[in-house]
A protein has these predicted regions:
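Positively charged n-region of N-terminal signal peptides that target proteins for export
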Residues: 1-8
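Cyclophilin-like peptidyl-prolyl cis-trans isomerases
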Residues: 2, 22-277
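C-terminal motif of bacterial Sec signal peptides marking the signal peptidase cleavage site
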Residues: 17-21
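Repetitive helical segments and hydrophobic/amphipathic motifs
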Residues: 12-13
Length: 277
């Protein structure tokens, strides 16, 4: 089990981070305190009076209902609400689907989107459980793209050791030292070192309840600490599962190195933001 977890971590370190572009010039990095006390998705998740939630309608598939967490990710949540209310997501697609990992959408392939990017927002009580709603990012910057965790396989972190992660941190820092601090290579390797440092921090702060939930419902804990989790699916899991089971082919958006592009377009008809009463 530990070997499988490590393999997942090594893969995840590049799978989402390098998959998207972004506009603007925000400084990479977290913009919130991960230890801030909030009610996140680590406990029971249900809609309560006053909650903000999104209903995403996918053509020929149905609706996915997502509880939003503005307390955990104020910038990210408001950005998504503004985009949804403006109709930005209408007609966009799920352009990338990886079974037992995530389904990603919201990319503007025209390159005409003028959305200011912003840093990630993380919290120990917001985790990548099955159905988590998150921002894809490029070197620490969020913009318009999101993903929904579709991995239902049990994740057992009860005896996980972070020693291998320490080795990865040191390795990337050693690589970075070979380059000028103003170079792209230095920036890339230090980003990777910080990626693993953030991941280690989140694993070390994974309490027993969080470990138990990962074991029960599944998810991708190897992404914790490096992506903004700002929502949690509460209804429409069957729709998510259908999307996750589609036939895929080589994805040019991933440099042609990944088989993840749905053979038939998965179109988002609309995203409606509501207040639960």
């Amino acid at each position: 089990m530990v070997k499988k977890i490590l393999a997942g971590i090594l893969c995840a370190a590049t799978m989402i981070t390098l998959s998207v572009g972004c506009s603007g010039g925000a400084t990479p990095g977290a913009s919130t305190d991960p230890s801030a006390k909030i009610t996140g998705n680590t406990g029971e998740v249900k809609l309560e009076k006053g909650d903000k939630y999104a209903v995403m309608t996918i053509k020929d598939y149905g609706d996915i209902t997502i509880k939003l967490y503005p307390d955990a990710a104020p910038k990210g949540t408001q950005n998504f609400i503004d985009l949804a209310n403006s109709g930005f997501y209408n007609g966009k697609t799920f352009h990338r689907v990886v079974a037992d990992f995530m389904a990603q959408g919201g990319k503007d392939f025209t390159g005409k989107t003028n959305v200011e990017s912003f840093g990630i927002e993380t919290n120990y009580n917001m985790r990548h459980f099955y159905g988590a709603f998150c921002y894809a990012n490029a070197l620490g910057n969020n913009s318009t793209e999101f993903y929904i965790v579709n991995n239902k396989k049990s994740q057992d972190y009860s005896s996980f050791s972070t020693s291998r992660i320490d080795n990865n941190i040191q390795g990337y820092e050693d690589y970075a030292k070979q380059y000028d601090k103003n170079s792209q290579e230095y920036t890339y390797y230090m980003f990777q070192a910080n990626y693993y440092r953030n991941l280690k921090q989140f694993i070390e702060n994974m309490d027993d309840a969080t470990k138990a939930k990962y074991k029960e419902v599944g998810g991708t804990p190897s992404l914790d600490g490096n992506y903004t989790v700002f929502g949690q699916t509460v209804d429409g899991f069957d729709v998510l599962d259908k999307i996750s089971a589609v036939e895929v082919e080589t994805n040019d958006a991933m440099g042609g190195k990944e088989v993840s592009k749905p053979k038939t377009e998965i179109i988002i008809e609309k995203v409606v933001i509501k207040d639960y009463e």
